[in-house]
Amino acid sequence: MSEPYASSPIFDEQTLPDALRNDHRTKTGTWGLLRVLEGEVRLIFTEPLTEHRVTPDSPAIIPPQATHYVVPVGAMRMQVEFWRERPDPSEGPING
């Protein structure tokens, strides 16, 4: 079983950094897996413009170098895992 090489802290709607609320991207070769532990966030990709609803039952894969940002929908807790290969969201959260 593959594992992430790093994970962000767990953020809530108050502690989510501006860097994640605005356009940003993962580095070359890094996949992100956005896991919502409680509540809901919107994940917006800007190239092309698409929006995904991310919930505890529906994590989201973020491809390498895909420009995106997140928008909390009310109270939430979320974490991002960083992978060297495409993650399998069904493997369950590492932290949380």
Q: At which residue positions do the language-model features occur?
A:
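Double-stranded beta-helix
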Residues: 3, 7-15, 80-96
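Motif-centric detector for short Cys/His coordination patterns
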Residues: 1-2, 16, 43-44
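Short, charged/polar surface micro-motifs in flexible loops or helix N-caps
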Residues: 38-41, 48-49, 86
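Short, conserved beta-strand element in jelly-roll/cupin
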Residues: 28-43
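Ligand-binding loop in jelly-roll beta-barrel domains
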Residues: 64-88
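Short loop/turn motifs at secondary-structure junctions and domain boundaries
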Residues: 24-26
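Short acidic-glycine-tyrosine-enriched beta hairpin
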Residues: 48-65
